[in-house]
Amino acid sequence: MQKILIFLLLVLSDILSKYFVFNFIDLYQFIKITNFFDITHIHNFGVSFGLFSGTIPSLVLILIGLLVTAFVMYLYINSNDTLERWGLFIIICGAIANIVDRSINGYV
């Protein structure tokens, strides 16, 4: 039960943070947080760093995201290392939030 609550909290915080960026930061505008960390409002229609943007249909990217998430879940289930499991758990939460975003908006 506690894991489900943490899962929901992480996924919702990911989605809410994107909501605030979308509604309060203009497209392509950035906010400097620290010397090495900025928040930038951008729409990613591709994969990592916008690769293949516009060349792969959104539905295909959603299906690939689901397959990769399933593989990471497999790794999570079969891991005996606590730290590794937490890392995989966080990756799964972010991946699911991205799948939700891409399903609703067509981009991440």
Locate predicted features.
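Alpha-helical transmembrane bundles and membrane-interface segments of multipass inner-membrane proteins
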Residues: 1-108
